């Protein structure tokens, strides 16, 4: 038994660490594990690791961090800091594990690379933003800035590396 979250994705992104902690307490009561796809793998990587460690500390649940990596250029050099934090949590008696996939790639929905302000009220709001010429221009400008002031998984990467790989309807192209 366990619980898995995708905190980079909507609607999981709306859960705060206190809610996660309370849910993880239930998981712990059944001897389960809490697996987290952390809130950030980009600009706020260390803070996202700290959030996972906080949940472990406060709930007593075993925690698995999915896809632990320092892939984006802004995070190069942060691995030792990340591992020290995990080791310190383990030294305090917390069960913390992590996994990592063996390739250099990233996959997400288009929603995840949009500025926070453009998606904060869900998909319907994002569609309305994209239909508005002025707001669409602001989205493009914000997505083109590097470094971003929001957690953009594309920050520091080149757009020619992006591959669109699936659509529900041809009209979405």
Residue spans of the language-model regions?
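Extended hydrophobic/aromatic segments used for targeting, binding, or gating
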Residues: 18-61
């Amino acid at each position: 038994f366990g619980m898995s979250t995708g905190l980079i994705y909507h609607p999981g992104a709306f859960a705060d660490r206190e809610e996660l902690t309370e849910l993880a307490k239930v998981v712990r009561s059944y001897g389960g594990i809490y697996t987290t796809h952390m809130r950030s793998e980009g600009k706020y990587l260390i803070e996202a690791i700290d959030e996972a460690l906080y949940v472990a500390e406060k709930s007593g649940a075993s925690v698995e961090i999915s896809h632990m990596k320092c892939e984006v250029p802004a995070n190069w050099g942060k691995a030792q800091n990340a591992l020290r934090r995990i080791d310190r949590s383990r030294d305090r008696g917390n069960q913390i594990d992590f996994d990592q996939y063996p390739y250099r790639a990233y996959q997400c929905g288009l929603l995840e690379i949009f500025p926070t302000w453009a998606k904060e009220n869900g998909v319907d709001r994002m569609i309305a933003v994209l239909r508005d010429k002025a707001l669409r221009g602001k989205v493009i400008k914000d997505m083109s800035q590097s470094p971003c002031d929001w957690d953009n998984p594309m920050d520091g990467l080149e757009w020619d590396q992006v591959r669109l790989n699936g659509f529900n309807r041809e009209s979405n192209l």
